[in-house]
Amino acid sequence: MDKVILVLLMSLGASSQPLTDTPRLFSMAVSRVQHLHLLAQRLFADFESSLQTDEQRQLNKKFLPFCNSDSIISPNDKHETQRSSVLKLLSISYRLIESWDFPSLSLSGGLSPKLSDLKTGILLLIKASQDGADMFSESTTLQLGPYENYYQNLGGEEPLKRTYELLTCFKKDMHKVETYLTVAKCRLSPEANCTL
C-alpha cells in the first residue's frame, strides 16, 4: 500500500511528465474491478445460501434497495455510457468506489484495501486523461450524505436485511464501475469494437 501511495505522489508531483503507461494502468484497473465484482457476486451468493428457508430468500429478493451511490449522476443505459467521455466514466467510477470507503468496513473479504488500490489507480488514470483540468472542481463535486449514517441505518433491527442491502448495492456498484472502466479502456484501442 505504501508503494501505491508513493507512486501516486510521484506521478501527481511530476505534472510536466505525462503518464505514458495508460493502457497498462487501464488493464490493471479493469482486472481489479473485475476481481471485486466477482467477489461481490460470491459474497452475495454465500449470503443467500446461508439463509435457512426459501421464504427468507424470496422476502429478500422482493426488496429493491436504494443505494447511497444512486445519488451519483451516472449514465442511465448502455447508449449513454458509450456516448460518455473517458474522463466522465473515470470520474463516475472514482466517485462510486469512493462511496464505499466506509461501508466496505462492514463487509467481509478484505474489501477496503482492494477498493483503496482501485481508487488510487483510477485517480492515476484521471490524472493521465485530464491534462491539467480540475476534474473535481466545486461545480462538479457531488455532495453525498454521510456514508456511515446511511449504511448504519439500513435495515434497522434486521441484520439480515441490512447485509442483503449492503451486498446488493456493492454488487450493483462494482458492476457499474466494471462497465465504465471497460468502455473507457476500449476507447484507447482504435481498432476495438466498444459495444456493450
From Swiss-Prot:
Family stated for the protein in its record: Belongs to the somatotropin/prolactin family.
List of residues binding Zn(2+): H35, E178
Database matches in SUPFAM superfamilies: 4-helical cytokines
Transmembrane segments: none
Keyword hit for Signal: yes
Name assigned to this protein: Somatotropin
Positions of disulphide bridges: C67-C169, C186-C194
Endpoints of the signal sequence: 1-16
Organism encoding this protein: Takifugu rubripes (Japanese pufferfish)
GO biological process terms on file: animal organ development; growth hormone receptor signaling pathway; positive regulation of growth; positive regulation of receptor signaling pathway via JAK-STAT; response to nutrient levels
Main location per the UniProt record: secreted
Keyword list, A-Z: Disulfide bond, Hormone, Metal-binding, Pyrrolidone carboxylic acid, Secreted, Signal, Zinc
Zinc found in the keyword field: yes
Purpose: Growth hormone plays an important role in growth control and is involved in the regulation of several anabolic processes. Implicated as an osmoregulatory substance important for seawater adaptation.
Residues that bear Pyrrolidone carboxylic acid: Q17
GO cellular component labels: extracellular space
UniProt subcellular location: Secreted
Record-level Gene Ontology MF annotations: growth hormone activity; growth hormone receptor binding; metal ion binding
